[in-house]
Amino acid sequence: MISLKGKKIVDLTDELVARVARIDGSIEQGTDDAYGHKWLSEETINETDGTMEHLVGANIGTVSDWPIGGLSGHMGAHIQLGVRHNDNWTGLPDGMKGIWDVPLTTYYGEACVCVLDNVRGRPILPEHLSNVREGDIVLLTSCWSGDEQPTLVGDTAYWLAEEKKIKMLGVGVPGISWETNYDGPEPDNSPTHRAMTGNNIPIVYPLANIGSLKQDRVFFISLPLNVERMEGTWVRAIAIEEE
């Protein structure tokens, strides 16, 4: 029998509070994710059995700062791969996969914890990631925010993907500025996306509480929804470490 005795489970996802449009017309405001996105929902009645349910999303135009109403799989903590996400970019290799194409074992395993408080406002270099082993899931965070966050530059992203052959990249936000040149011209835009998804390495973010982990190696689990054709899905990410 599998036992978690002597182990501690750490939640690496921030709690979101949904904005709910109630049946009576009232609105209960919620909280934003790390990127300022709201979790929108609408209360309704299931006519089959009379139970109350919540539809994910809102009527178009009813939320001024998110007028499209619909939610994507990229709100809150989520995981993404390249197919149907950035395989429309030029310069990416053949053979890219979607979330649904890779084995479930891709999404859990041994992870190294990289707390980069000492890299304040500077590029993250391989020398800062000396605890990363080949095939690791890599969890990055720092205590910094805004312009003081360490930045994952393209050369280091490719080093992780192609030399260390990491299994998955998990990023604390705020804490790490993990993408550069995202608005640049192709094929030089978004090197971290290109390094990871071009090598079929999932990215999971925005994560929280990585800095609370006590060990620099943990067991990490972040399972996507089992929905084909979705380029990104919401996750509940956890780490398991020794107490």
Identify the function of each model-found stretch.
Residues M1-E243:
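Active-/binding-site microenvironments in catalytic and ligand-binding cores
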